[in-house]
Amino acid sequence: MNRLSLLPPGLYRICPRLPRRPARRAGRWASKLHSSVALILLATALPVEADVADTVAKVKPAVVGVGTFQPTGRPRANLLGTGFAVLDGRHVVSCAHIFAKPLDTEKKAVHAVFIGRDRQMAVRSARLVATDSARDLALLRIDGAPLPTLKLGDSARAREGWQLYFTGYPIGSILGLNASTHRAGLAAIVPIFTPMQSADQLNARTLKQARDAYEVFELDAIAYPGNSGSPVWHPETGEVLGVLNSVYVKGAKEAALSTPSGISYAIPVSYVHALLKRAALDAAEPNASEPNASE
């Protein structure tokens, strides 16, 4: 083998006729250079992944399943979505639409929070203490020992292009209480109002929706039923920036499972701060320093 071929193309072009001895030295130098570059790239890449893994390990204990529990029903536990503990560890944030259906009082059904994993699952009864139907947010209170908590960040500092993550229970009724974490690119910050296809669709209700429209996070991520209420968090700090609540569906509702669009939406955590304030609870102060965007 021609030893000159071991040189990177740029070096090969500027010294095509090196004498034999210098060529050997150049080859050894290039080999060492390649090794050094590889080590540098490895050293800079690994900590990023390690940091995310460390953050996942800190986030997951605060993420819970939410739904209903009925002692005389089958099944007794009905996992409907995701939530996460905040403040004193006895308050859980989730989505309001999860609790829209009235409880079956004949079967003594109660709102519930599910902790742990499948066979080690523990059930805590919960009660709704505040809701914001317009922003699809709910706050529950549980009794017993406090849970690990997540810190609420400042969603006003979120920027399009950030790489975020969310943790929850996709299709939890089938896959069980096993939290999974997914990456989500913050594709856009958009009004939640859906434009009408024709003037015939304009009425008092749609006009009010347009007037009251607020901005949400559009995420480049696939989410499934059960992910509603998942915290959307920053990989460096673990701070919650949003609450996953919906997906864009192409066609019928069933398409959310069969042909997911890859477009999901999250409610900015600023509305969680407002909900806690309205419930006379003190939320954690947002971090004063702006986190760096993760590429």
Label each PLM-derived region with a short phrase.
Residues 109-112, 117-126, 160-165, 179-200:
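Beta-strand/loop subdomains of soluble extracytoplasmic proteins
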Residues 59-76, 142-151, 180-277:
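Active-site region of chymotrypsin-like
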